[in-house]
Amino acid sequence: MKNILLACGAGDSSGFIAQKMRKAAQAQGLDVSIRAVSDTEIMENIDGIGVLLLGPHLKHKFEDIQKEVAPLGVKADIIDRRCYATLDGETVLKQALKMMD
């Protein structure tokens, strides 16, 4: 199973995207776990995660967060602003899966 964690300010917006990603994954028959948390909850939810995707509004925190998660083997990136705004879960899922290859 591939484990993906999304993070935004409060976990709400990323929660909507996670829901769309789960639907896309289910439609494709993929074995993935997708969760969403607030940026303050990342480290307490990072165990077993392969990819961490941040909302675009957390770009200013990206370097610091990446430094924390990289030693744990977690790949991190920022969700494209357009995908985030339109809740394009399918494209965000593709982004995460590509990072895991």
List each model region and its residues.
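P-loop/Walker A phosphate-binding loop and immediately adjacent motor/lid segment at beta-alpha junctions
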Residues: K2-I4, G9-G11, F62-R82
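Short acidic/histidine-rich motifs immediately flanking catalytic phosphotransfer sites
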Residues: I46-V51
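Conserved active-site segments centered on acidic
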Residues: K2-D39
